[in-house]
Amino acid sequence: MEQLKIRHASAMPAPTWRWLHMNDTEICLPAELVRTGDVEIEAADELLNTAVTFEGAVAGLQERVDAARAGAPDTRACLRAALGADDAEAACGALSDLDVPALSAYQERAAREEAAGDVARAFETGIGTDARSYLNFAAGETVTIATGAGAEGRACVRVNGGAGTTVASSIDAVAAPDSTLSLTITLDAAGDGGSGGQQGAAGVVGSELRVFAGARSRVDVTVYVTADSGFTALDDSGYVLDEGARVQVRHIVLGGGTTATGMAADLRSDTARLDIDTRYLAAGTEVRDFNYVVRHRGKRTVSNIIANGVLAGASKKCLRGTIDLVHGCKGSEGTERETVLIADEGVDNKTVPTILCDEDDVAGNHGATIGHVRPEQLFYLESRGVSPEAAEALFIRAKLEDAALCAPDERIRAAVVRLGDRLIDGFAEELEGDAA
């Protein structure tokens, strides 16, 4: 089967040892898929009939950033090393060769980005440029959802995949100052199932999302991935937060043979806050890949990356979480924490939390808790008539039941129940019995 390959996807900003095979991933997509447009957008007319653009919102922020930077040149020696002698002397004044440090490729790139202070050029998404181009092409057009100043809005985007097709949405969400926006995205596809993994992909569902959270706005984004195991799901997003913005992101990844979830955020202005809550499940030979990059640029900014998941069968998961405390973000704090339950010996689990720091008076915290079902626990359950397969199903059922009970509408709940029936015999009946 001929394939398209997205190489170096979901790449870490500062790579670690290559032999760990965690710096990035390669996404394989069937080349012969038909591009279709089965995307439903449920939103009030005032959210869709707008002249507001993501680029315009970023340009407005750029004006304020430039005004704040005026008259305060950055004279650090690392900029001389990154910019070169001529540009650096103009920006920083003359320095001797002994004052110029040696920089890694990442440090040089970061220093140039800081010197430019260009919000638009610094914008990024979690999976990367190639995935963004693929999803935008598959979507055909980008739809803007925007709130007015001080207004409240709610929208739902449903991406419905099918065998032999590529279906994707491309959404720009712009929350005006002091407004509230709630956005739900579902990536769902029901098919013949397949064996999971990239080789058996029956189709692709995806979402490309750009979010601008205006000053003091409140943005809530929830993404449900409930595709059957024969499908590949791509969830790529990038966020820009203005002063005092509060953004809550929930990623609930329950299905899909191969899923790639990538998110990058620019906490550009002071006192912005970002909270990420990720919940995932993988069974059989399914693959889960996550990449989170949070750049703290404003003062007293806060971020939290919290992940919780269950891995069963011969599934694989890699989670990369990078918190970048950029020069100038004094008083900021970033935290990343993961809890994963490994229900089978065949699981391949990788987690690489990373804290990058170029500022003092900041805090970066990270940790991971990995729980195994110990042999003596399985022996105890077997002595009570519970087989290892039934014990594994208990953990899977708990994750699915939580997702079904918390689903925001009946269609999402039905998709979760469909996945449950595929993994566990009689899941729907037991769930209805518990609800009764």
Where are these predicted regions, by residue range?
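Conserved beta-strand/loop scaffold segments within soluble protein domains that form the structured core
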Residues: 2-9, 35, 90, 94-98, ...
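Long, low-complexity, mixed-charge
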Residues: 1-138
